């Protein structure tokens, strides 16, 4: 986290860091050239620590796939991703055709993908596998709201398996209370980072994508 980016902050930084203070543009260019991931503040720093310590990988692109069991949550995540420069691209025709054969008609076969309140562990897993395999996406955000009665503790294991098979990072977004926190502990058990809001999940995805790009 580079402080002293504005003129006022730069002046204040001189009294604390001395020689490390200077024109922000110079540091930014040096960071990019060296492959340093620049963070905008402590919220992003916390997201970076959580995502990178668990995933231990970055990606060179910025195309993100969003899969959820609640349409509104998918839209919120898409907005958060777009505001950070991530690309929420439409599903390619090949992936759409394959998923249309697998998923119930009432599911939204798009990006974001809404599996609705009828989602099952298997539907989440199949959707993730097909989109990462044929969609050309670099990273996925899976938002399980735990409303659908057919979701079980096996979901975390299945999502982890598909992420490992595709060799691509998957981030979990799962807002909620005590019940949800107990469920999301299962994702962490299987090596998947969990974030409590669309904004924090999108921040984590942005950091993973930024880490794989050079100037």
Enumerate the language-model features and the residues they cover.
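Short glycine-cluster motifs
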Residues: 11, 60-138, 143-145
